[in-house]
Amino acid sequence: MVEILYQRSGYPYLVPLCIACDFDGTITTVDTAELTLRKFAAGKWEKYDVLLAEGRISLEECMIEQFKLIKAPKEEIIRMLDSAIGLRPGISEFVEFCRNKNIEFTILSAGLDFYIDHIIAKYGWNSVTRVSGTTNMTDGITVEFPKHRFSDSKTFKEDFVKIQKEMKKDVWYFGDGTSDREGALAADMVFTVAGSRLSEIMDAKGKIHRDFQDFVEVLTVLKNSLA
C-alpha cells in the first residue's frame, strides 16, 4: 500500500492512501443513471432530484424511487449506454498506475451496479473495487444500498470515507455532483470535475478542492505527491 508523506510540527509521517471515485459524470463523461432514466423511466423521475437537492430526501431514497421507474431489461440498458457514453480521458492509465503502486481505488456510485461491473470487466480494471447499491431486476429496478456504520452519515459515500479515515487512511475524493457532497466534505483532498455542481458546492462550503478536466492531469498530481 502506498503511503503519502506529510510534515507535522517539523516531523515527517506516512499515511496510507485511498482513492474514492464517483462513477457517473466523473469516470464517465455523462451521467449513465440520468441517461437511463431519460430513456427508460416510466414516470416523473426528475421530481426526486429536486427533493434531493432541497435536502428533503436522502441520496439512497432518491435512487430507490427513481430506479423503480426504469422499465427495460438489463441487456438493453447496457447496449444503450455502451453506444452513448465515453470515459474521461486518462482514467485507464490512472487506474493502472494505482494498481502498479498498490493504491486502493474504489468506485463509489449511486448508479447501476451492473453497468459499473460491465465497464470494470470491459477495461480489465481488476484491481478496482465497487461500493454501490445492489440492484434486482423485477418490476422496475429495486436497489438496496450499503448500511451505514456511522449513525450521523448522510450517505453511504460519506460513510465509506469515514470508515477509511477511521482506519487512518488519507482519502482523495473525486466527484462531480450533489450525490458526492457529503463524501467530499469528509475527505482529506477533493478533486472536482471542472464546472460541475460539486465544484460549486465545495466553493460554497469553503472546502479546498482542485478542479480537473481529465485524469491525465490528476495522474501528474498523484505522481508528484509520491515523488
Report residues per predicted region.
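Acidic, Mg2+-coordinating phosphoryl-transfer loop and its flanking beta/alpha structural elements
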Residues: 109-110, 169-206
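Conserved Lys-Pro-Asp/Glu-containing loop-to-beta segment of HAD-superfamily phosphomonoesterases
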Residues: 152-179
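Structural recognition of alpha->loop->beta junctions
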Residues: 120-135, 186-188, 200-202
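Short acidic-hydrophobic, aromatic-tinged amphipathic segments that line or gate anion-handling sites
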Residues: 131, 191-193, 208-217
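Substrate-recognition element of Asp-dependent hydrolases with the DxDx(T/V) motif
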Residues: 91-121, 129-134
